[in-house]
Amino acid sequence: MDRVEKHDLKIDAGLHRFLVDEAMPGTGIDPEHFFAALSALVHDLAPKNRALLARRDELQAKLDAWYREHGAPVDLDAYQAFLKEIGYLLPEGPDFSVSTANVDAEIATIAGPQLVVPVMNARYALNAANARWGSLYDALYGTDAIPDADGGTRGRSYNPARGAKVIAWARDFLDASVPLAAGRWSDVGGLAIDGTALSLTLTNGTKTTLRNPAQFAGYSGSAEAPSQIVLRQNNLHVVIVLDATTPIGQADPAGISDIILESAITTIMDCEDSVAAVDAEDKVVVYRNWLGLMKGDLAEEVAKGGRTFTRKLNADRVFTRPNGETLTLPGRALMLVRNVGHLMTNPAILDRDGREVPEGLMDAMVTALIALHDIGANGRRANSRAGSMYVVKPKMHGPEEVAFACEIFSHVEAALGLPENTIKMGIMDEERRTTVNLKECIRAARDRVVFINTGFLDRTGDEIHTSMEAGPMIRKGDMKQAAWIGAYENWNVDIGLECGLSGRAQIGKGMWAMPDLMAAMLEQKIAHPKAGANTAWVPSPTAATLHATHYHRVDVAEVQAGLGSRPRARLADILSVPVAARPNWTEEEIQRELDNNAQGILGYVVRWVDEGVGCSKVPDINNVGLMEDRATLRISAQHMANWLHHGIVSKVQIVETMKRMAEIVDRQNAGDPSYVPMAGRLEQSIAFQAALDLVLKGREQPNGYTEPVLHRRRLELKAKQRAS
C-alpha cells in the first residue's frame, strides 16, 4: 500500500488524493493545516480512546467474576450496590434541560419517519435523501398494505379493482387527517381556490371547505384549476395531485391522480453498521458519496424497465401560499451522518508509531470537513438551513464515552474554523451502561444532543454479552417480552422528556426489520408515536410513506406533554437479567433456535465477507425477508455463544448446524450470479469460517461486537483476491 507521510501520519495515497483533490477544494481548508490538525487529533486523543476501551474490558471482567459467583441477580439491591461500587452505575446529578441551539425543524419540531441507509451505496443514499416525499398510492398499491383478496391482486398490469381499494384507503386517510366541513373526501368532485380558502365541490353539487381552514397550506397552477393542493397536519404536508390527463385522474371524479405524503423527514447516512468498509479503498467510497450529498452533485446511472436514467438529488418544491406568497418546502430529507463508534481502528491511516488510527477520529474529521460544503463560510445551506452538522454516535458505553465524543467534536470544530457546538450529536442508547446512566450521558452532551434512540437490536446483544456468565439466556424470540426491554424503551422516553428534549430534539425508536410486511407495520408501528417517540426507523422509502400516516393520526407533542407526569420506568426492571429460570427446552426447540440463529448469521456474513455488502435483506428460516446488519448479527452470535458456554448446545452441534444451514443459504442465493457457494468448500470459505468465529469465539469478542472478526476476514479475502 502506497502511503503519503504528513505530520507524523502515514496516509494511504488514495485517501490522501481524495482529500486533497476532491474533498478540500471549496472548503477554504489548506491541506497542510488539515493534516497537522488531524495528526494533533490522533496523537492527543487516541491514547484516551484506548483507555476507554480498556475500561470496558475491566468492567466486563468484574461483571463476569460476579456472575460466576452469584449467577443471575436475585437480590437486586446487592446487585445495584456492586454496580455502583465498580463504577458501572454512576450517581445521578440534579435535573437539567438540554441547551442545544441552531437545530433544524426536521429534528426539533417535526415528528416523522427516519431512514437509515448505507452511504457506501450511492443509489440507496440518493433514494433515501429523496424519500422526503412519497406517493401514497404507490406505497399502498405495491405492498401488502392492501390485501389481494376480492379481486385486489397485484399483477404485471394495472388492476382497477386494486386501484379502487387504494383510492378508498387514501380517501379514508384524508377524512381522518384533513377532514371536510361537510361530506367526505370520497364525494369530492372538484377543487379550486376561492380567495385564500380551499373550496371543494361534492359530486352532489354541494360546496364545502376544510373543517380547519388553516390546514390549507398552498397550491400550484391557477386558482380556478390548481394542479396541486398542499394540506398540513401535525407539521407534515400532503400534496394532492390533480391531473385528469392520467388514467387514474381521468377515472377520478375530482381528477385526483395521486396523493403525495411528506415521508422521511430525516435520513441517517450510515458509515457504520450497514456498511462493510475495512480499508482506505472502502472508506474513500463512503466519504466520496457523503461529499456528493453535501455538494449536491451525487448522481447514479440507474437501469429500470429497459431504460437508463440519471438519479440525482431532488430540488425543493415550490408552491403558492393562500395569501399569494411563495411556499418552499424541502425536497430532501435532512441528512445526518452516523460515524463509527470508539472501538475500531482502520489501516487507512497510521500514527507516528505505526499503529492504525481510531476510525472514529478519522470519521469525525473527514465527514466534518466534507460538511463544510453545506455549512462552511461558503456552504450551500441546502441540507441544514440552521448551519449545523448532525453526527449520530453509536455504541458508546456511559457518560465518559459521550464526553469523549464531545471532546473529539470540539477538536474538529477548532481545526475547521467552526463555532463551538456546530457539530450536533445523536446518542444511540444501545449499550446497557448508557441506558442505566442515560441522564448523565445526555448531560455530558447537553449543548450538542439532538437525538436519543433506542437501538433494541444492539442493546439486546449487549444485554447477552454483559451477563454472559449469569446463565443461559431465554430464547431470542422471547426477548421482546422480557421485563428489561419494555422498561428500557419507556426509560429512554422518560429520561429524554426529563432532560427537556421535547420540541428540541428527537426521541427515537428502532427499526421495522421486515420490509415486505407493510400491513403488519401499519398495524403495529403506530405504537412508536403513541409511546412518545417523534421519530422511528423504517427500512425503505415506501415504508417511510406508510409510517408517515401514523404521525398524522398521533400528535406526538401532545403525547409527550401527557407522558411528562408519569413515573419514570423502574431501573430494577432494566437491570433484570433475561436468564431462563427453567432452561428445560425440548431438543426440537433447541435445534430450531440454533437453525434460526445460524441461518441468519450465515445469510448476512457470506455477503459481508465475500461481497462487501453491509446491509442485506436476508430470508430467515421461514423465508421471510429480514433486514440484517451488524446489530442483528451481534444478537444471533452472542445468543449461540451463550448457549454453548452454558452447555445447552455443544460445539459439535453448532458446527453441524452451521454446515446444514450453509446449504440452505446457498440455495437462497442461487439466483445471485456473483454468489460463491459455501457448501463443499467450508474449510476454504472465509465467510463460513468467519461465521464460526463469531459463535465459537463469541465470548472473547469485545462487548460481543462482530466488527473485529468481520473486518479481519474481509481483509483476508481482499488480500487473497489481490494475490490471485
UniProtKB/Swiss-Prot annotation:
Q: Name one GO biological process term.
A: glyoxylate catabolic process
Give the Cysteine sulfenic acid (-SOH) positions (modified residues): 615
- Which amino acid positions bind Mg(2+), per UniProt? 430, 458
Q: What positions does the entry give for glyoxylate binding?
A: 338, 430, 455-458
Membrane spanning segments where?
none
Pathway field of the UniProt record reads: Carbohydrate metabolism; glyoxylate cycle; (S)-malate from isocitrate: step 2/2
Location(s) in or outside the cell: Cytoplasm
Any idea which GO molecular function terms this record carries? magnesium ion binding; malate synthase activity
Q: Provide the binding site for acetyl-CoA.
A: 116, 123-124, 274, 311, 539
User: Which cofactors does this gene product need?
Assistant: Mg(2+)
As recorded in UniProt, its EC number(s) are 2.3.3.9
List the active site.
Answer: 338, 629
Task: Kindly list the GO CC terms recorded for this protein.
Answer: cytosol
Purpose of the protein: Involved in the glycolate utilization. Catalyzes the condensation and subsequent hydrolysis of acetyl-coenzyme A (acetyl-CoA) and glyoxylate to form malate and CoA.
Q: Which NCBIfam families does the UniProt record give?
A: malate_syn_G (TIGR01345), PRK02999.1 (NF002825)
Report the sequence similarity comment from the record: Belongs to the malate synthase family. GlcB subfamily.
Tell me the subunit arrangement: Monomer.
Q: Which HAMAP family match?
A: Malate_synth_G
Q: What is this protein called?
A: Malate synthase G
What organism is recorded for this protein? Answer: Sinorhizobium fredii (strain NBRC 101917 / NGR234)
Organism classification: Bacteria, Pseudomonadati, Pseudomonadota, Alphaproteobacteria, Hyphomicrobiales
